Amino acid sequence: MKWLVLLGLVSISECIVKIPLRRVKTMRKTLSEKNMLNNFLKEHAYRLSQISFRGSNLTIHPLRNTKDLVYLGNITIGTPPQEFQVVSDTGSSDLWVPSDFCAIEACSLHTRFRHLQSSTFRPTNRTFSITYGCGTVKGVVVHDTVRIGDLVSTDQPFGLSTAEHVSRCTPFDGVLGLNYPSISFWSTIPIFDKLKNEGAISEPVFAFYLSKDGQEGSVVMFGGVDHRYYKGELNWVPLIPAGNWMVHMDRIYIERNVIACSAGCKAVVDTGAAFIEGPKSQVDNMQKFIGARPRGSKYYVPCSVVNTLPSIIFRINSINYPVPGRAYILKNHRGRCYTTFKENQWSPSTEIWILGDVFLRLYFSVFDRGHDRIGLARAV
């Protein structure tokens, strides 16, 4: 489409403001030294975040990758601004960060919002509770000015956690939800919708490029698409239904053998999920097909066979999206190679797959709120 090309050209222009990407120490070594790596890997499927580049029509935020599990970037809240590292999550809709009132250990390890230091802070009497795969976050709903790079949302509703019953090893301060308002836990307008409604972004789209192998360069961009981050054309997939980043998937197969989703199924494109998740029986079938053996909570293969493993092909809207062995196998701190397929415990009675970062590192993704669709193309 012409406007995609034009926006890509705009992003290259001198009007973009670039904020340097800061490398974050990998979580793998830190957690391994404390014998907490297994718990972290088991509990956390989140990932990503933002800093900023700015063009007249396109805002780009670099993301920092920690251990190939979470991508972190910065937002600021309050006046004067207080900075937080957050996970940008298309699987949820709400923004929350720790409150200065939160005295438990999980909060004390992160930056906490000091509301008394913000002249634009506005409290409410509403409370919230959000349940994630890693635990529960509880707190109060408040309002203040939130900045994502040069994008500014005044009087933005968000959550201040007063209790976080999650792992104390999470490398992020909070979560920036980018899903539809319909799944908001506290039924307030999410930040992307508020920016869209106020005309702060030129097009109601955002997109992700996730770098591979711990490299720098991951970005989330708002208001347009920079074509330099993908090859070929974007393949558009309608949502089913509008209101959640979920699409129809035709099937999953290996070497012409259908191994899952044989009658069609649903797939959530989730930047907040680290791995690829599906029904237990079908995930077990995939593990068996590639010769993976269980050990503890994971499945392992000999590292010597990774480059010979077959690609797993996800067919979406009549387009094949192969994921090769080198993408779906990761190596732990002991040099052992494990698969990145997990049971989706959230929908045991329905065949729903979650396409997380393992998939999205290969495919540039565009989330188009204006047309209720997702665009996918091979990432550069």
From Swiss-Prot:
Subcellular location, record wording: Secreted, Extracellular space
Glycosylation sites (chain numbering): 57, 74, 125
GO MF annotation terms: aspartic-type endopeptidase activity
Tissue: Trophoblast and placental tissue. Produced specifically in the invasive binucleate cells of the placenta.
Keyword Disulfide bond listed: yes
PROSITE patterns according to UniProt: ASP_PROTEASE (PS00141), PEPTIDASE_A1 (PS51767)
Highest taxon above the source species: Eukaryota
Signal peptide start and end residues: 1-15
A Pfam family annotated for this UniProt entry: Asp
Keyword terms: Aspartyl protease, Disulfide bond, Glycoprotein, Hydrolase, Protease, Secreted, Signal
InterPro entries membership: Aspartic_peptidase_A1 (IPR001461), Aspartic_peptidase_AS (IPR001969), Aspartic_peptidase_N (IPR012848), PEPTIDASE_A1 (IPR033121), Peptidase_aspartic_dom_sf (IPR021109)
EC number: 3.4.23.-
GO cellular component: extracellular region
Disulfide bonds: 102-107, 261-265, 303-337
Cleaved propeptide residues: 16-53
Residues annotated as the enzyme's active site: 89, 270
Single Gene Ontology BP annotation: proteolysis
UniProt keyword annotation of Secreted present: yes
Positions of the Peptidase A1 domain: 71-377
Bilayer-spanning residue ranges: none
Family: Belongs to the peptidase A1 family.
UniProt name for this protein: Pregnancy-associated glycoprotein 6
The organism of origin for this protein: Ovis aries
